Amino acid sequence: MSLKTAPVIVWFRKDLRLSDNLALLAAVEHGGPVIPVYIREKSAGPLGGAQEWWLHHSLAALSSSLEKAGGRLVLASGDAERILRDLISETGADTVVWNRRYDPTGMATDKALKQKLRDDGLTVRSFSGQLLHEPSRLQTKSGGPYRVYTPFWRALEGSDEPHAPADPPKSLTAPKVWPKSEKLSNWKLLPTKPDWAKDFSDIWTPGETGALDKLDDFIDGALKGYEEGRDFPAKPATSLLSPHLAAGEISPAAVWHATKGLSRHIASNDISRFRKEIVWREFCYHLLFHFPELGEKNWNDSFDAFSWRDDEKSFKAWTRGMTGYPIVDAGMRQLWQHGTMHNRVRMIVASFLIKHLLIDWRKGEKWFRDTLVDADPASNAANWQWVAGSGADASPFFRIFNPILQGEKFDGDGDYVRRFVPELEKLERKYIHKPFEAPKDALKKAGVELGKTYPLPIVDHGKARERALAAYAAVKKTT
């Protein structure tokens, strides 16, 4: 084969889209046949159950989009190097392209593989597609990484505008013979019995089309009033883009540019607030890039001396949404029912696990990793450490959310609680976030029997707060 006609392998990873996919566009511009491949890597470890559900549907959507453009998606599982070498041998490809990833395992794999393939005379090119800017690009005046969000935001805001999103290729050149592909159904990514994901499709449509639809809906609706509305879980006031960004079904650059030119009918503070959330995701990846053990070790190592409790009974009650605190239970049940949780409530339930129950943040991070459709190695780790007080630019440990007051402030009418904790549906408004304070007649009228139809609190807020502060004080003494 001549250089001009040799196939190019496009290795899809966290970029399951055709639009604004710089690796795919480079393959098309190469001029030869394009062979898209997705590898279920052995070295990457297992995905969480919710992410597996998402991946199945996202790969199906990507496969359909590629077929419409004249291509197809080759699926393979195992060792990435072996699979790519087999594909190169089978197809005669002389070039491999991919979009960069920034988790520690992925970066190590890519670095080693790129060098090995280049040593064999192959062309290997990587592109930016997961973030607005490379995490190594922004540096403090002293040349180091940022550790505080606000200066990071200012630096990014003052840097070059993210690239304008590229259109998808109109067509793909197919090879004369397609390499063998595994069947997606054989990967068994979907739950069977029980089908705990049966309600996911009520709110989620994985894939690039679903991502673009979510973005359009948000721009036309919830972006207006976002700054205030985003904190109220009963309102449809958030973008719901996080799982699409996590899977790479839409690029952050596309989201960023979609908010341009809207100031005539949407307040600038709403646009700025939303962009800051996009940049917070960037900040999380900046931290993970410079501190690869973010998901395993405390950023602030003084927390290594913290005396966590081994309380499996309380942890189980938390995971099941049976703590006796309605706002916490509503969040945990939303997580199980829809694979997501409102951001404000994520902070509340994380604070409750860490500070009310004194359970290690890493247990919570692992649970979220298994149950969130938008589980992300950078955001998940950084946000849990932020709540714990052990992370970069973290909320101080002594900031302990009162789950009753948080519920009353952000779910005043109890609509969120009533939706996900239906056993409290008929309880009157003033008791919806503290059923344990309701008089017997109010409970009876609502059909609530504490300890039977709904649990009593597994911990007293006041006592838990005192215990948490004492544990924190003990750490301060030893550091």
Swiss-Prot record:
Site label Electron transfer via tryptophanyl radical, positions: W308, W361, W384
Gene3D superfamilies: 1.25.40.80, DNA Cyclobutane Dipyrimidine Photolyase, subunit A, domain 3, HUPs
Coiled coil: none
Record key words, sorted: Chromophore, DNA damage, DNA repair, DNA-binding, FAD, Flavoprotein, Lyase
Disruption-associated phenotype: Cells lacking this gene show an attenuated photoreactivation after treatment with UV-B irradiation.
Amino-acid positions noted as binding DNA in the UniProt annotation, renumbered to this chain: R230, Q406
DNA repair keyword on record: yes
Residues the record lists as binding FAD: 226, 238-242, 277-284, 374-376
PROSITE patterns: DNA_PHOTOLYASES_1_1, DNA_PHOTOLYASES_1_2, PHR_CRY_ALPHA_BETA
Cofactor, how bound (note): Binds 1 FAD per subunit.
Catalytic activity: cyclobutadipyrimidine (in DNA) = 2 pyrimidine residues (in DNA)
Alphabetical GO biological process terms: photoreactive repair; response to light stimulus
Keyword Nuclease (UniProt): no
Cofactor: FAD; (6R)-5,10-methylene-5,6,7,8-tetrahydrofolate
Domain (Photolyase/cryptochrome alpha/beta): residue spans on this chain: 6-132
EC numbers for this chain: 4.1.99.3
Region (Interaction with DNA): 277-284, 343-344
GO molecular function: deoxyribodipyrimidine photo-lyase activity; DNA binding; FAD binding
Task of the protein: Photolyase involved in the repair of UV radiation-induced DNA damage. By using blue-light energy, catalyzes the photoreactivation of cyclobutane pyrimidine dimers (CPDs), which are formed between adjacent bases on the same DNA strand upon exposure to ultraviolet radiation. Can repair CPD lesions in ssDNA as well as in dsDNA.
Family: Belongs to the DNA photolyase class-3 family.
Protein name, entry field: Deoxyribodipyrimidine photo-lyase
Organism whose genome encodes this protein: Agrobacterium fabrum (strain C58 / ATCC 33970)
Taxon lineage: Bacteria, Pseudomonadati, Pseudomonadota, Alphaproteobacteria, Hyphomicrobiales
Encoding gene, per UniProt annotation: phrA
